[in-house]
């Protein structure tokens, strides 16, 4: 018979919004990441074997990666929103969005036009990847053609990888309508493979 345990909430106290977690089968543990907005270091990684005892093992974003993500140039309460953590083709992968970038501050702070173009072509959506949760983390890989916020990344049984997120509806039937869309993505180049398809429109 499987032993039962008692979980006392909150399992993580303090500011830990938008949690995303995986069961890391290789190491028989839960790995969890949360939002940190404009704070650096950012995207803390926690691990647990039993859902009750948690250990903070690393932060994904250091000062150098924060600069590459343009975090110093976001407005208050901007920055990294709603990370999604997955194992994709054996790598640890985080899909996320940078919100509320101030272009003027970015340019004044030394950001190049090409950096801003890549950022806006991806609407602030990016991938980070690593071979270990302790890092180092590679990226950002800006996802050109991504639309919206709150991305998810998924690998199916055949090894195909899909990017899914919410965006304003292409043909809205009411003000503020959104839709979920999905598109296959190449996990080696982090570029889209084919045309995206709406998966749902909130009807």
What are these regions (language model features)?
Residues 1-203:
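Carbohydrate-active catalytic/glycan-binding domains of CAZyme proteins
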């Amino acid at each position: 018979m499987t032993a039962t345990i008692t979980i006392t909430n909150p399992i993580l106290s303090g500011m830990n919004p938008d949690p995303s977690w995986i069961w890391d089968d290789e190491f028989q543990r839960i790995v969890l990441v949360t939002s940190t907005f404009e704070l650096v270091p950012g995207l803390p990684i926690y691990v647990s074997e039993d859902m009750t005892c948690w250990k903070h093992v690393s932060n994904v974003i250091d000062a150098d990666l924060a600069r590459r993500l343009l975090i110093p140039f976001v407005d208050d309460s901007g920055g990294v929103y709603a990370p999604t953590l997955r194992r994709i083709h054996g790598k640890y992968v985080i899909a996320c969005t940078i919100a509320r970038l101030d272009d003027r501050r970015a340019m004044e702070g030394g950001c190049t036009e090409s950096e801003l173009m890549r950022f806006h072509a991806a609407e602030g959506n990016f991938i980070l990847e690593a071979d270990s949760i302790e890092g180092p983390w590679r990226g950002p890989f800006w996802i050109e053609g991504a639309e919206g916020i709150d991305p998810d990344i998924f690998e199916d049984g055949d090894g195909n990888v899909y990017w899914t997120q919410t965006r304003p509806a292409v043909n809205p039937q009411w003000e503020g309508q959104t839709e979920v869309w999905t598109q296959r993505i190449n996990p080696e180049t982090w570029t889209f493979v084919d045309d995206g398809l709406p998966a749902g429109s909130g009807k």
